[in-house]
């Protein structure tokens, strides 16, 4: 009946959001273990392959990490934060699509709104993260790298989290297929690249900027934030 159909569709959407392939039956916990594994392995294999790019990004920027080893300590923090922001944005947008509440705003304005929200979240989290990174890394370079990257990552993650479901919907595909694990993996790769490239740029140019302004590195970094 109608209630069963609604329940089945809701179950499929929830499974898709968690990167789990839905089966014909709704009773997931009574399914055979091999069936359970088969439903999960496809998306997990895709995500593992995508995660290889993160390893390649780190390997390609090994020289930066060798110069400032403590930069590596903040890679999980930045990747996790970006993934969480992207997951929040995608959840809000997918819900808006399912209830039609996003239609009054329009796709471009919805993406722009989420991008601004991501930037604001980045600024707020910088207030918490940058002092800790500066203290823990014992270097203004680490604080600057983490702070600048955090702002860029949260903005990018929120934009991607909103844009991908809208793109899928425009293509006639189920927006729920743009699952949280997929967005998290993508933002992890992009975030690691942004972070290490930012740190690499600062390693080269920060001494020049400090010399040009004639102030200490710590005062320069404090002025930036």
Language-model-derived ranges and their functions:
Residues 1-73:
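Cytosolic regulatory modules rich in charged/polar residues
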Residues 27-46, 104-123, 143-147:
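Soluble-to-membrane junctions at the N-terminal ends of transmembrane alpha-helices
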Residues 210-225:
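Intrinsically disordered, low-complexity linker/propeptide segments enriched in Ser/Thr/Gly/Pro
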Residues 11, 87-90, 121, 125, ...:
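Alpha-helical transmembrane segments and their lipid-water interface positions
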Residues 43-51, 74-78, 82, 117, ...:
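Alpha-helical transmembrane segments in multi-pass membrane proteins
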Residues 60-75, 137-148, 178, 209-214:
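Membrane-water interface of transmembrane alpha-helices in multipass transporters/channels
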Residues 196-214:
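Juxtamembrane boundary at the C-terminal end of a transmembrane helix
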Residues 8-21, 60-69, 85-110, 161-183, ...:
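Juxtamembrane helix-loop transition segments at the membrane interface in multi-pass membrane proteins
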């Amino acid at each position: 009946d109608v209630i069963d159909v609604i329940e089945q569709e809701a179950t499929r959407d929830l499974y898709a959001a968690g990167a789990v392939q839905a089966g014909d039956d709704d009773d997931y916990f009574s399914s055979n273990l091999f069936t359970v594994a088969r439903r999960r392995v496809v998306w997990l294999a895709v995500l593992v392959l995508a995660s290889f790019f993160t390893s390649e990004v780190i390997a390609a920027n090994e020289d930066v990490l060798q110069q400032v080893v403590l930069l590596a300590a903040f890679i999980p923090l930045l990747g996790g934060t970006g993934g969480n922001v992207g997951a929040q944005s995608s959840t809000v947008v997918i819900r808006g699509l399912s209830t039609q509440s996003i239609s009054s705003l329009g796709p471009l304005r919805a993406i722009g709104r989420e991008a601004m929200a991501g930037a604001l979240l980045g600024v707020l989290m910088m207030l918490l993260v940058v002092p800790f990174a500066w203290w823990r890394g014992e270097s203004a370079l680490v604080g600057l790298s983490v702070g600048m990257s955090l702002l860029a990552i949260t903005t990018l993650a929120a934009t991607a989290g909103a844009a991908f479901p809208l793109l899928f919907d425009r293509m006639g595909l189920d927006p729920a297929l743009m699952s949280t694990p997929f967005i998290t993996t993508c933002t992890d790769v992009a975030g690691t690249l942004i972070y290490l490239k930012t740190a690499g740029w600062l390693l080269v140019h920060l001494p020049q900027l400090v010399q040009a302004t004639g102030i200490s590195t710590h005062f320069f970094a404090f002025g930036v934030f």
